[in-house]
């Protein structure tokens, strides 16, 4: 089965690579329109997936990721339309020169070819990834989680119908609908057909891909994100950022999971934090230095377990640790962070600059929420993933991250001397 999918995707990629920006945008507009026109089919399929997942004991954070509403589906369609409005990087001349021989040399952006994406209970990923791949002239093979099998099947059927109505092969966007996990291992060895693999899921999935894949893998998306509260912070303003970073949508990978508080401001900051977190329904997981003071406040507080510093809660839970100074905070982030998104809240710009220079994450913020790490917020449109590695892309992966380049030499029957 996968062999045939790979052949179809590779053949489709050759046709996609020849499309103009206008032709690709016409396809995307058709997909967006059809997602809205066929919304009832997609939402009914999703309702069945959610019901099964709830019956099987899936946690609330994952159920939130899985669930589609009419508003969310409309937002997904609107995201596709936003991709239409983005500049197409394919064909862009990155740089060029004329050599002494007279050969005119250009480095030009081209599609990667076929992208493979493995993800879990995130039905929006199906459309986000497909739209970005099509915009950049890439075919894509999707493998969603078993929890989203009906939703993904319905969504991909809509996309394929839109492709065919525009004269393009359905093989441009395909989904593996068999939940057999052995197919994941088989997919990881499809280097004959797939040019880049992107896993979007937990640490176990990323480890599996790194160990078994014969295809170049882009890893990331696991967000153990930190905010360091410096001693010079403006408490009221800092709390607004923390509430946003923790509560706006707790199930996302750019949500803060650990708050590092400078010991010199703890006495004034912790009571205010407790009050604010109580109002927001956040459970605080406090270290020994913060526990007693936080327990005196209104927030729900438990003693933090050492392993929780490495946890991506994806829920209304927040670690709180007292640190001696900026060096202590940076050391903690280096040990427990996932190089996703980390922030400092401070009025001391020297400390801010040190934090930016010394915290080696894909996105580092000064006096801002970690929630900004998002393709849409960065002006990239829908993102295919957030990469926490350094090759071939880093941070939110937009259109350029789905391209490579080729060298093109144009001569007049020019020969090398």
From Swiss-Prot:
InterPro entries reported for this sequence: Ald_DH/histidinol_DH, Ald_DH_C, Ald_DH_N, Aldehyde_DH_dom, G-glutamylP_reductase_CS, Glu-5-SA_DH, GPR_dom
Cellular component, GO annotation: cytoplasm
Principal subcellular localization: cytoplasm
Annotated keywords: Amino-acid biosynthesis, Cytoplasm, NADP, Oxidoreductase, Proline biosynthesis
Function of the molecule: Catalyzes the NADPH-dependent reduction of L-glutamate 5-phosphate into L-glutamate 5-semialdehyde and phosphate. The product spontaneously undergoes cyclization to form 1-pyrroline-5-carboxylate.
PANTHER family tied to this protein: DELTA-1-PYRROLINE-5-CARBOXYLATE SYNTHASE, GLUTAMATE SEMIALDEHYDE DEHYDROGENASE
Family: Belongs to the gamma-glutamyl phosphate reductase family.
Name of this protein: Gamma-glutamyl phosphate reductase
Originating gene: proA
């Amino acid at each position: 089965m996968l062999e045939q999918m790979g052949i179809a995707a590779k053949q489709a990629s050759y046709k996609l690579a020849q499309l103009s920006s206008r032709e690709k945008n016409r396809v995307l507009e058709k997909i967006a329109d059809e997602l809205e026109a066929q919304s009832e089919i997609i939402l009914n399929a999703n309702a069945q997936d959610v019901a099964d997942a709830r019956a099987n004991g899936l946690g609330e954070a994952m159920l939130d990721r899985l669930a589609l509403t009419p508003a969310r589906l409309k937002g997904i369609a609107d995201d596709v339309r936003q991709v239409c409005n983005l500049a197409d990087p394919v064909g862009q001349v990155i740089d060029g020169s004329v050599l002494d021989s007279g050969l005119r040399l250009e480095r030009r952006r081209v599609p990667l070819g076929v992208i493979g994406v493995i993800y879990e209970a995130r039905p929006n990923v199906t459309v986000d990834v497909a739209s970005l791949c099509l915009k950049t002239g890439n075919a894509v093979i999707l493998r969603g989680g078993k929890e989203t099998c009906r939703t993904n099947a319905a969504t991909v059927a809509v996309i394929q119908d839109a492709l065919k109505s525009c004269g393009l092969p359905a093989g441009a966007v395909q989904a593996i609908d068999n939940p057999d996990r052995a197919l994941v291992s088989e997919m990881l060895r499809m280097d004959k057909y797939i040019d880049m693999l992107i896993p979007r899921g937990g640490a176990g999935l990323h480890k599996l891909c790194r160990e078994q894949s014969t295809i170049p893998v882009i890893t990331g998306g696991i967000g153990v994100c930190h905010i360091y509260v410096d001693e010079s912070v403006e408490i009221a303003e800092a709390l607004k950022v923390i509430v946003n970073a923790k509560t706006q949508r707790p199930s996302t990978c750019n949500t803060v999971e650990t708050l590092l508080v400078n010991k010199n401001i703890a006495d004034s900051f912790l009571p205010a934090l407790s009050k604010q977190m109580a109002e927001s329904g956040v459970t605080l997981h406090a270290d020994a230095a913060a526990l007693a003071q936080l327990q005196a406040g209104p927030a729900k507080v438990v003693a933090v377990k050492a392993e929780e510093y490495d946890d991506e809660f994806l829920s209304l839970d927040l670690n709180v640790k007292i640190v001696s100074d900026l060096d202590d905070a940076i050391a903690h982030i280096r040990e427990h962070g996932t190089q996703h998104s980390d922030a400092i809240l401070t009025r001391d710009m020297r400390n801010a600059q040190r934090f930016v220079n010394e915290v080696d994450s894909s996105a580092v913020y000064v006096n801002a929420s970690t929630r900004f790490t998002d393709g849409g917020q960065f002006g990239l449109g829908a993102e295919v993933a957030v990469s926490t590695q350094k090759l071939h892309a880093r941070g939110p992966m937009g259109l350029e991250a789905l391209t490579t380049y080729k060298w093109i030499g144009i001569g007049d029957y020019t020969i090398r001397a």
